Amino acid sequence: MRVKGGTVTRARRKRIMKLAKGYTGSKHRLFKTAKDQVMKSYTYAFRDRKVNKRNFRELWIARINAGARMNGLSYSKLMHGLKLANIDINRKMLADLAVNDADAFKAVVDEAKKALN
């Protein structure tokens, strides 16, 4: 007797078509093109999870630099001063301080300035 695998095939196709929801044209209608696009989408997602980390680091550095320059230091001098002062605070937290708590950020910058002199 020939086995057609109906339920398994239908479930597999249904899963792919569900993932392809929202795509335009044949990419959400036809199984083969939908499958190709879903695979490509997974590739983009994998790549962009890495890019996202780069983008956020860039944003944090830009914010720290802006805050540091308002307090009379460049970004690189601030980071060097923090290293000399043994202040171990990451860029994400520094950027948050620069944006949301200017007084605390100024205190950190002053410590870095002291260490530089």
UniProtKB/Swiss-Prot annotation:
SUPFAM superfamilies to which the protein is assigned, alphabetical: Ribosomal protein L20
**Which InterPro entries does UniProt cross-reference here?**
Ribosomal_bL20, RIBOSOMAL_L20_CS, Ribosomal_protein_bL20_C
**A GO cellular-component term linked to this record:** ribonucleoprotein complex
Annotated TM spans: none
An example GO biological process term is: translation
Q: Which GO terms describe its molecular function?
A: rRNA binding; structural constituent of ribosome
Q: What is the protein name given in its UniProt record? A: Large ribosomal subunit protein bL20
Give the organism's phylogenetic lineage: Bacteria, Bacillati, Bacillota, Bacilli, Lactobacillales
Q: Which gene encodes it?
A: rplT
